[in-house]
Amino acid sequence: MDVLFVAIFAVPLILGQEYEDEERLGEDEYYQVVYYYTVTPSYDDFSADFTIDYSIFESEDRLNRLDKDITEAIETTISLETARADHPKPVTVKPVTTEPSPDLNDAVSSLRSPIPLLLSCAFVQVGMYFM
C-alpha cells in the first residue's frame, strides 16, 4: 500500500520536472499561427449567357437521316423494245426501297446456337492442356 501511495505522488513529480539545460521558448516562437483567407468572387459584373449551339444536334440529325435514308425510284414506264407503229403495252415498275445492310453485330446475334463455338473452344483448350 505504501508503494502505491509513493507511486501516485512520485509520477506527477517525475513527469512534471523541468530540466535546467532545456532551452525555453518564447511565447511567440511556441505558437505557430496561420491565417487562411477565402476569396469569394462577385458574379454581379458578369452577364449570364445561356445560348445553346444547336449546330451539333442538327449535324447529328442529318447523319441519322442519311443512315436511314430510303432511296425511292419514281414510278416509271419502260418500253422493252424500240418504238413501233403499234405501241405495245408498257411495263410498269414500282418504286424500290433499300435499307442499309445490317452490320456484323446483327449477323452475330442471329446465330442459332453458340454450342458449336463453345465446343470448338473447349477442344482447343483440351488440346493445349495435353501438349
From Swiss-Prot:
Signal peptide interval: 1-16
Question: What's one GO-annotated cellular component?
Answer: extracellular region
Give UniProt keywords alphabetically: Secreted, Signal
Q: Which InterPro entries is this protein grouped with? A: DUF4634
A Gene Ontology biological process in which this protein takes part is: epithelial cell proliferation involved in renal tubule morphogenesis
One Pfam short name: DUF4634
Where in or outside the cell it occurs: the entry states: Secreted
Q: Can you tell which superkingdom this protein's organism belongs to? A: Eukaryota
Q: What is its main location?
A: secreted
- The name this protein carries in UniProt is Uncharacterized protein C1orf54
Origin species: Homo sapiens (Human)
